[in-house]
Amino acid sequence: MKLPEINLTDVITLIIQEIAHRSETFAHIDVHRVLVCLASNRSNSRGGTFGKLVPLRFKDGAETVRYRGRLYAMPRLNHGGLEQRYLIYFYHPRFFNLPPLEKLKVVFHELYHISPDFNGDVRRMGKRKALHGGLRERFDELFEEEVREFYAYIKKTPYIKFLNMNAHALKSSFKKISGHRMKMPKPVVVG
C-alpha cells in the first residue's frame, strides 16, 4: 500500500540541516535561507548534472554587478518570510537514482560551494576556475572525510530509508511526489 505523499525537497532540506548541525565546515549555513528545489533531466542520458547551487548575490555578497556597462542584480527571493541567499537544485530522476553515499557526496559538493561568509556568493577557490579551483576531484577531496563521517551517522537514522530509494522506488512507495520547483533565476538589468 502506497503512502500518501512525500515532499522530496523538504526531506533533503532536513538532511542539509543535519549536515549543518553536525559538521563544522558547514556550520555557517543557515538552512532557512537555502531553498532546495527540484529540476528535471533525462534519466537515460550518461553523465550530466546531479545538483546545482545558484547563488543569489555576486562576488563578496554584492547585490549588483556592472558588466559591459550595464548594472545587473539577481531577483530577490523570499521563502517562509526570509530572503533567500542560495538555491540548490537536485535533478530528478538522475540525482535520486544514485546510491545513498553518492547522493550525499552531491549534497556536500553543492553545500561546499556556499561562501564561508554565507553572503549569497560562492566559495572562491582561486583567481581562475574559482568554483572548483582546478580539478573537481581535488575539490571533492576537501570534504571527503566529512561525507564518510556523516554517512556513518545517517545510516543509523530514518533518513537512510529515503536515501536508499531511487526514483522508481519513490514512485512505487508514494501516491504523490512533490517538491519545490522554480525556474532558475538569472541576473536582470537594473541600470
Where are these regions (language model features)?
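Metalloprotease/metallohydrolase-associated module, dominated by Zn2+-dependent proteases
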Residues: 2-7, 12-88, 117-191
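Generic "edge-of-domain/loop-turn" microfeature
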Residues: 43, 95-97, 113
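Active-site recognition of the HExxH zinc-binding catalytic motif
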Residues: 103-117
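Short pre-active-site segment immediately N-terminal to the catalytic Zn-binding motif
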Residues: 89-106
